[in-house]
Each structure stands twice: as C-alpha cells, then as structure tokens.
Amino acid sequence: MNQEKIMKARMWTAIFIALAALVAAFVFAGLYSDEKTKTRQSYIDQYEYNITQAADEIDKYLEKQTDYDLHYNMVLSDMGAARSFIFLVDDYAEHQKTINELHYCFVKYPVQMKDKLEEVSTALRHITEHLDKGYDEVREIVESVDRLGN
C-alpha cells in the first residue's frame, strides 16, 4: 500500500511537470511570435526611413543644384541601407527586387540617373506613402535606363 502511494505521488508530480512544461512552451512560443513581429516592424520602419532619407537627399540636390557628388553618395548610402533592411523582411521579395534594381542603376549608371532624380524622388515618396504605384514607377525608371550606356 505504501508503495502504491509513492507511485501515485510520482505520477501526479510527473503530470504537473508535464503541464508546466507545456504551458512554458506555449508562453515561449507566444513571446517569440510577438518579438518576431516587433523585429519585422522595426526592419520595415528602418527601410521606410532610409527610403525617405534618400528622397530628401535628392530633393536637397534638386533644390540647390550644388555638390552633386555628395548628395549622390548620400542617396547611394541610404538606398544601400534600405536594401539591407528590406532583405530582412520575408514577404517583401518583389519590393526587394525593385529596390535592388534601383540601387544597381544608381551604382552602375550615375550619368543616366542624374537625369532621373526628380522621377526617383517622386517614386520613393510614393513608396513611403504605401502606394504600390511607387514600385511601378521605380520599375519604369529602371527599365528606361540604357544598360549599354554609362
């Protein structure tokens, strides 16, 4: 009889530990999901911030028309940072491809891109306003670049 009580107590302890572990697993999964969502949103916020910075830098150059190299390099830097952050967001593959192509055009074809700065600024503003036409405008700009030129 004594042995039976000990086994019953051990069984209840095992059940209690199993339930506690199950609850802990659910809590961990919930916290992980919440943190993942926050991190994703922070990446998107940084992406949009860098896109805004690039558009602001283009606007500064268009307004003053001085020190092109400085403003162009700042735009390159901001576009590179935006590219890096959008890479970290899973379901932004099409947007990532579009931004990568625009950044590539800025790197490889600076002479051609100088003539398209106003269009790029408008497209980037549309992107930060969450308008899909901004990505379409960027695609049009990228397609209009002569890949055989400079």
Language-model features: where?
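Polar/charged alpha-helical tracts
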Residues: E4-K8, K36-Q41, K60, E140-E143, ...
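Hydrophobic transmembrane alpha-helix bundles
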Residues: V27, E94-Q112, T128-D136
